[in-house]
Amino acid sequence: MKNLEIILQSSKMIGSGLATSGLIGAGAGVGIVFGCLILAFSRNPNLQKELFSYALIGFALTEAIGLLALVMAFLILFI
């Protein structure tokens, strides 16, 4: 019975570690959003306010996916 508990605990840790790989995509997505924002500012400086609001929406959606991955990792680890 003790071996089964050890296997269960180790599989929870492995699953939690794999679930956090979604955070890599969120980090890359935020970099892409703000990189494209800088390019858009340099091409059309007159639209800075409008472009910045679009970038914040993109940032929020990208971070939401990352937070969902983090929540799933904690659920796998502790439940």
Swiss-Prot record:
Pfam families: ATP-synt_C. It comes from the Eukaryota. F-type ATPases have 2 components, CF(1) - the catalytic core - and CF(0) - the membrane proton channel. CF(1) has five subunits: alpha(3), beta(3), gamma(1), delta(1), epsilon(1). CF(0) has three main subunits: a, b and c. The chain crosses the membrane at residues 21-41, 59-79. Belongs to the ATPase C chain family. InterPro entries: ATP_synth_F0_csu, ATP_synth_F0_csu_DDCD_BS, ATP_synth_F0_csu_sf, ATPase_proteolipid_c-like_dom, F/V-ATP_Csub_sf. SUPFAM superfamilies: F1F0 ATP synthase subunit C. CDD domains: ATP-synt_Fo_c_ATP5G3 (cd18182). Keywords: CF(0), Hydrogen ion transport, Ion transport, Lipid-binding, Membrane, Mitochondrion, Transmembrane, Transmembrane helix, Transport. The keyword Mitochondrion applies. This is ATP synthase subunit 9, mitochondrial. The gene is ATP9. Coiled coil: none annotated. One of its GO terms (cellular component) is proton-transporting two-sector ATPase complex, proton-transporting domain. GO terms for biological process: proton motive force-driven ATP synthesis. GO terms for molecular function: lipid binding; proton transmembrane transporter activity. The keyword Transmembrane helix applies. PANTHER family: ATP SYNTHASE LIPID-BINDING PROTEIN, MITOCHONDRIAL (PTHR10031), ATPASE PROTEIN 9 (PTHR10031:SF0). It is a multi-pass membrane protein. The record marks E63 as: Reversibly protonated during proton transport. It is found in: Mitochondrion membrane. Mitochondrial membrane ATP synthase (F(1)F(0) ATP synthase or Complex V) produces ATP from ADP in the presence of a proton gradient across the membrane which is generated by electron transport complexes of the respiratory chain. F-type ATPases consist of two structural domains, F(1) - containing the extramembraneous catalytic core and F(0) - containing the membrane proton channel, linked together by a central stalk and a peripheral stalk. During catalysis, ATP synthesis in the catalytic domain of F(1) is coupled via a rotary mechanism of the central stalk subunits to proton translocation. Gene3D superfamilies: F1F0 ATP synthase subunit C. The lineage of its organism: Eukaryota, Amoebozoa, Discosea, Longamoebia, Centramoebida.
